[in-house]
Amino acid sequence: CRKLFPWISLEGAKYLFVGTHLKANILEGNNLADITPIRLTTSAGDVTFAGKANTLSSGITATDTTIPLTSSTGFPASGTIQIGSETINYASVSGNNLIGATRGAESTTAATHSSSDAVLCATLTITDTSHGAVQNDFVTFSGASSLGGNITATVLNQEYQVANLINANSYTIKAKDTSNNTVFANSSDSGNGGSSVVGAYQLNTGLDVFVQADGWGVGTWGAGGFGSSTSLSFTNQLRLWSADNFGEDLILHARGG
């Protein structure tokens, strides 16, 4: 928690502002309400989705950390896949191989899989020109239609946290159902969500620890080459909140927000 601020309404209701590096919340009794400001709401059709699925080009054992695909085209640079009942996280893509696999993720059991077994991917690529998001930001989608398979409209039209940034125009999320269970795209998920998708981006998240503005080792792990320098901007500063009340109204502001 980065900031706590208590105040009382004119009717005597007691509130507590709870500001973290990710969210702005109000606590009333046992009820926590998300009041994080919206930074940007897109026009309909600005946001598109892409899901991927493929097959194994050869069999793998329960300990293999390289997953060979028939084709890796369109697979995110890192992500989460499912083969049979096993969930696997992978760290990178090389040729048609998923590299650095962590087997038996999400409490599943690592297993042997055969050539041509389906490889389903939960990591969706989102395209939105000049989205302005940073890693760990939150965005709520609405107006999306099914991609055609497991990635239904219900899966898409909810709040998501940005998993990884690809560039200024795209990023990835991990598909889930409304109970936060991972959902994996299948071969029928070939759509893009339709022309009515709207993305409501919340205020950029901040850092939870202080780092110097320039130097080495201050970026996200794995974000650049070893020993490369980086710098901070207003979108990745230490999150500091200012909060006060005007009567019963809460006034708040995030550093750099």
PLM-predicted stretches and their roles:
Residues 15-40:
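Beta-propeller domains
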